[in-house]
Amino acid sequence: MGPFKSSVFILILHLLEGALSNSLIQLNNNGYEGIVVAIDPNVPEDETLIQQIKDMVTQASLYLLEATGKRFYFKNVAILIPETWKTKADYVRPKLETYKNADVLVAESTPPGNDEPYTEQMGNCGEKGERIHLTPDFIAGKKLAEYGPQGRAFVHEWAHLRWGVFDEYNNDEKFYLSNGRIQAVRCSAGITGTNVVKKCQGGSCYTKRCTFNKVTGLYEKGCEFVLQSRQTEKASIMFAQHVDSIVEFCTEQNHNKEAPNKQNQKCNLRSTWEVIRDSEDFKKTTPMTTQPPNPTFSLLQIGQRIVCLVLDKSGSMATGNRLNRLNQAGQLFLLQTVELGSWVGMVTFDSAAHVQNELIQINSGSDRDTLAKRLPAAASGGTSICSGLRSAFTVIRKKYPTDGSEIVLLTDGEDNTISGCFNEVKQSGAIIHTVALGPSAAQELEELSKMTGGLQTYASDQVQNNGLIDAFGALSSGNGAVSQRSIQLESKGLTLQNSQWMNGTVIVDSTVGKDTLFLITWTMQPPQILLWDPSGQKQGGFVVDKNTKMAYLQIPGIAKVGTWKYSLQASSQTLTLTVTSRASNATLPPITVTSKTNKDTSKFPSPLVVYANIRQGASPILRASVTALIESVNGKTVTLELLDNGAGADATKDDGVYSRYFTTYDTNGRYSVKVRALGGVNAARRRVIPQQSGALYIPGWIENDEIQWNPPRPEINKDDVQHKQVCFSRTSSGGSFVASDVPNAPIPDLFPPGQITDLKAEIHGGSLINLTWTAPGDDYDHGTAHKYIIRISTSILDLRDKFNESLQVNTTALIPKEANSEEVFLFKPENITFENGTDLFIAIQAVDKVDLKSEISNIARVSLFIPPQTPPETPSPDETSAPCPNIHINSTIPGIHILKIMWKWIGELQLSIA
């Protein structure tokens, strides 16, 4: 264990301007506060785990200080303890800290034995990651040999999370050619090691030097670059943080720009330190002159859920059927969404507040009915939001502190006094979820959600979009086991004319089925309702509430797996259908869809990105059909197909995260986001977690000229997909965002084509270069670009920095295809020298019809390798009769094999022989 001394790690936070983040982290005088480490409810109780987390973080603060030139340190952290663990005197109730906004999740390994620390990164270079994942065994120090000290590995992950930097190693392609010479992928290039391969046969193993492949110019499969235990290089933390000497990130001076790794691929060849230096945190801090204190810790234990509904019943709620819709959505929340064991109260407000019901615990259906009957029946008066909030605080404090409680605030009106209670809200420790109903809801409403970490949603007056019910359906608990949460399977609406039918199907898959509820609403008269289960049996027993204009059916036990069919008939009116359920089994993770946007405010012409993360437990669901419905305050709805293709807005292919740019703004104000996901004949579940941004697995190290091998890294097959069909249906609220600076129609074209991020190149036929990429659009990843500009150079930096001066390829015959189509282009390099050992670099720029240009693409690379001539062996006397070998020579370039290198972002080498 020579290279692994007791070390510490860096915790540095990159707060993106305008970015949507649930994180509670704040930077205060060089110290980071409010970081949440959550222990998963399924982790067995182990009090030593808490101390191990503390030790890791305490070590980290010093390393943070050193690595950033005394600029940052780790000030405090909250450790979130499961409700199922024993209570202790020093465990207190959380305030705003929840599992949903945790920065670090400590959970059992998936699959078992895979303890690799990793970070979810959905965005591009410089964009904040989602969450760090660690296992109890990793934190306990049981993986020191494989990943080095826990603190150092955690720094590596935190840089992914807060700064949006990427790995500087490459598990798929560990070596590359540079000017005809083999180089190990590393940063900095001064790190030393030996290229060896471990061979095992018959229970015994031995080590030998890697064999040079005279055809490809690279080493054989299985070759490892094993590091010397003693190094002098100080960088880089994103390559090999476990090495004692490494205490820095790569800078522009020592960064290895040619290495085919994700950092170069995603960040346009920039060093990690350059990316970090561009962060807002770095720009607003200066180095410290004194030693900071050790970090402090708070131990927070999840308790019973406490919720108070604060509902607007002012005069404006009488218009547009709003009060009735509030009752429908409120009943869904009370009858289905809120979990058993929760404490729920209700306050209404107009010009003043009115307590409808004190806190009661939901232990039975009768408790739910009691609250549902207290929903407001009449609307009148003005709007005083602060009165409602203050009354809710009073209701909660009669039984519990407000810390960690939740308030669901719905309003449709303006209130210019809302800022008067902001300080009280901050001091309360309560989480406020806001629902803005209609076009005139108070503009300051979202501030309440932002300052408390609550959800912000918007529902228009377009009843058929079912926005209000979706908003309340999204308010399941942010804590506790996922098996207890309400999951929305369907949400649909339609305006019928002349006794038309609203027909459709809902899939109940094997991961859900408990507490399944069918909810139907109407605007005029009760419709005819027909429902059949998968066996064709007609279902009856709907509870009809003519006053609220809704009917619902709770399926007893576990609903049958399969396709449920419904038919609704009515005269001219609007109907909606909502179906919710829960996990069928506490030990079988349900398929979930989590949707969001990359920011909650968007200033035109800045594009917005919509994400949908589809998982069963930790396993991603691939090849689903995913669409986002984005509705503006004008009532206009845009439908986006979200893709998991690794192009455009989508950062990584086949990781279960579906993404797309939104550019179709039509007005200023609020927009709601809703995602529909369907799994059919093509959908599949990946057995293992896809390769994420994670710390380097150490194959071994060299100590006193001897190689000490670690056990082989757990195999993670990127193609390990279960081909059994995954049929399911889900809907998910993606919250809302607010757009500004949108010009009046006609809206000008200010959006360029999207950046090409998956350009690959290979030599074809000895003299031609074949390019492939995913087509961008006229506006990012929508429409069709007008033309492409392709340039080449023998210098990677010249092509990046002097693209317009580099040699241009004739693309007259290249007509762009529609966005997200595969493009193929074959050309012959001209007016450039291409000889043995030469690397040729290629990049593309897309141009739209108004001459707006995309960013330069990733840089692809082809390398020409001519194997050395091998003299014929002199035959031994007893081999004189041996026949001569039959030699085949490439007909295009005699005596030369061509090495074709397809390099995605100079990152993912794929080698083949022409």
From Swiss-Prot:
It holds the Pfam family VWA_2. Induction: By IL13/interleukin-13 in tracheobronchial epithelial cells. Up-regulated by histamine in a dose-dependent manner. Significantly down-regulated in colorectal cancer. Significantly up-regulated in the IL9-responsive mucus-producing epithelium of asthmatic patients. Significantly decreased in nasal polyp. Significantly increased by TNF in upper airway mucosa. Residues 306-475 form the VWFA domain. Glycans are attached at residues 503, 585, 770, 804, 810, 831, 836, 890. The gene is CLCA1. One of its GO terms (molecular function) is chloride channel activity. GO terms for cellular component: extracellular region; microvillus; plasma membrane; zymogen granule membrane. It comes from Homo sapiens (Human). Residues 46-199 are annotated as: Metalloprotease domain. PROSITE patterns: VWFA. May be involved in mediating calcium-activated chloride conductance. May play critical roles in goblet cell metaplasia, mucus hypersecretion, cystic fibrosis and AHR. May be involved in the regulation of mucus production and/or secretion by goblet cells. Involved in the regulation of tissue inflammation in the innate immune response. May play a role as a tumor suppressor. Induces MUC5AC. Glycosylated. It is found in: Secreted, Extracellular space; Cell membrane. This is Calcium-activated chloride channel regulator 1. Residues 1-21 form the signal peptide.
